[in-house]
A protein has these predicted regions:
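Transmembrane helix-bundle signature of multi-pass secondary active exporters and lipid flippases
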Residues: 23-75, 139-146, 235, 239-304, ...
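Short loop-to-helix capping motifs
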Residues: 125, 161-162, 190, 269, ...
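Transmembrane alpha-helix boundary and packing residues in multipass membrane permease domains
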Residues: 23, 27, 39, 75, ...
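Small-residue-rich hydrophobic transmembrane alpha-helices
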Residues: 49-109, 146-165, 275-333, 337-339, ...
Length: 460
């Protein structure tokens, strides 16, 4: 097939940008709508922004399940296509859609039943709890849009149709940006309006992605009649994707615990947690392009692994690490030079500026190391070694970051230097880069180096 041949024969530099650029553009649009969403909410009140910020760990946990499952589907499908196994590729795709539906049901039930307890575990401010409940119950209760959208976009990406996935994601983001001010300000619905605008955008993107897969993606055949779950395929999907789910979920746990540390020990309490939430919104403009690059490279590595093209695999991994590091260094420079300007977008108060400016400058020091970690983590996922990514993520965010942040917060509280807590991020990133390099060295020695350089037909 033409798209298969593109993954296997197009020059690596050209192929990386051919695959990644549409995803990068769509993810930048996604980052824009994430920020616009929070900006509009911040114009209602700081309490509204705090509610949405405290909802982030639960919302991200849901997206972790959806995206991590899709990672497993994408990698497994890429290998099947690389090995010319069309039937297996189709089976993987259909089981991926089944898992997306199961994930929606699970998150819907959890969101509708546990939302109140989740917010009360973080704060005792009743206004924040009530607004947070309104937001989270809607976003999780109607999450079939985001589950379907992410899975179907990965099917498009995995078959070389990255430009089509850009259309679907961009459509959802633009609809959300248009509807946000209408629901929040015209209809005076506040955070509830933000949640409704979000799910409408996700549902529209889901429907559009389904149509594109059925009409414009001949490499995958979606046949719903007579479908039965294939538990062996599902097991293989999660053998690859579950570490990715857990890895991203670890980020939710980290954010939840970090919010607890800030609210308890930082002198600014909820305002410090809100500033931390703003940082996460802003850093998406830096990290989203790198994740887009990574998502474009994963099917390249997976396909060439299936085709036993070692030279192309290594070149793709090396180039992606270089490009990712360049993006992250640029992002670090922006955070160092313009932190106040970035925070003022969210109508930051003087207290939030005093907390947020040093936070952005200190945390962003970790960016220059994160690029290589993300790029090499993508190669782990593509080659079915997501456990390495999981190990790195757990070490960085739970084993190191949270304990170090807890200790530094205690020291900062007693010494009157609240800014100490933010140094936990660059400290943890230094160690995670070292662990990532060790894992990649092991992967290269045990797996990559054993493949023929240019395919099995060239083995002497």
């Amino acid at each position: 097939m033409q798209n298969e041949n593109k993954l296997g024969v197009m020059p690596i530099d050209k192929l990386i940008w051919n695959m990644s650029l549409p995803i990068i553009v769509s993810m930048l649009v996604q980052a824009l709508y994430n920020i616009v969403d929070s900006v509009f909410v911040s114009w209602v009140s700081e309490a509204s922004l705090t509610a949405v910020s405290l909802a982030f760990p639960a919302q991200n946990l849901m997206i972790s399940l959806a995206s991590g499952t899709a990672v497993g589907v994408n990698a497994l499908m890429g290998r099947a296509l690389g090995a010319k196994d069309q039937k297996r590729a189709d089976t993987v795709a259909m089981n991926g859609l089944f898992l997306a539906f199961v994930g929606f049901v699970l998150c819907s039930v959890l969101g509708l039943t546990l939302s109140d307890a989740f917010f009360r575990s973080q704060t005792d401010v009743e206004e924040i709890i009530q607004m947070g409940n309104q937001y989270l119950m809607i976003v999780m209760g109607a999450s079939f849009g985001i589950f379907g959208q992410l899975m179907l976009e990965r099917l498009l990406q995995g078959t070389g149709h990255s430009i089509l996935s850009m259309y679907t994601q961009g459509t959802g983001a633009i609809i959300n940006i248009i509807l946000d001010p209408i629901f929040i300000f015209v209809f005076k619905m506040g955070v509830t309006g933000a949640a409704i605008a979000t799910i409408i955008g996700q549902i529209c993107a889901f429907i559009f992605a389904l149509i594109l897969n059925l009409k414009k993606n001949p490499e995958i055949h979606l046949v719903f009649r007579g479908f039965r779950p294939n538990w062996r395929i599902i097991g293989s999907i999660y053998a690859i994707g579950l570490p990715s789910v857990v890895m991203m979920a670890v980020g939710s746990v980290m954010t939840f615990l970090m919010n607890k540390i800030l609210i308890t020990y930082h002198s600014a309490h909820e305002t410090a947690a809100t500033a931390f939430g703003i940082y996460f919104k802003l850093n998406s403009f830096v990290f989203m392009p790198v994740f887009g690059l990574n998502n474009g490279v994963i099917p390249i590595v997976a396909y060439n692994y299936g085709a036993q093209q070692r030279t192309r695999m290594v070149e793709a991994i090396k180039r992606s690490a270089i490009y990712a590091s360049c993006v992250m260094i640029l992002g670090m420079a922006i955070f160092q030079l313009f932190p106040a300007t970035l925070l003022q977008i969210f109508k930051a108060t003087d207290t939030m500026l005093s907390v947020g400016i040093p936070a952005l400058r200190i945390i962003s020091l970790s960016f220059c190391m994160a690029g290589a970690c993300i790029a090499l983590g993508g190669s782990f996922q593509a080659l079915g070694k997501s456990i390495y990514s999981l190990i790195v993520s757990v070490i960085r965010q739970l084993v190191l970051l949270i304990p170090v942040a807890f200790v530094l917060a205690q020291i900062g509280r007693s010494s009157g230097n609240d800014d100490l807590v933010w140094w936990a991020f660059p400290i943890a990133e230094v160690f995670s880069l070292g662990v990532t390099l060790l894992c990649f060295r092991r992967l290269y020695r045990t797996l990559i180096s054993k493949l023929p350089p240019h395919g099995p037909e060239n083995v002497q």
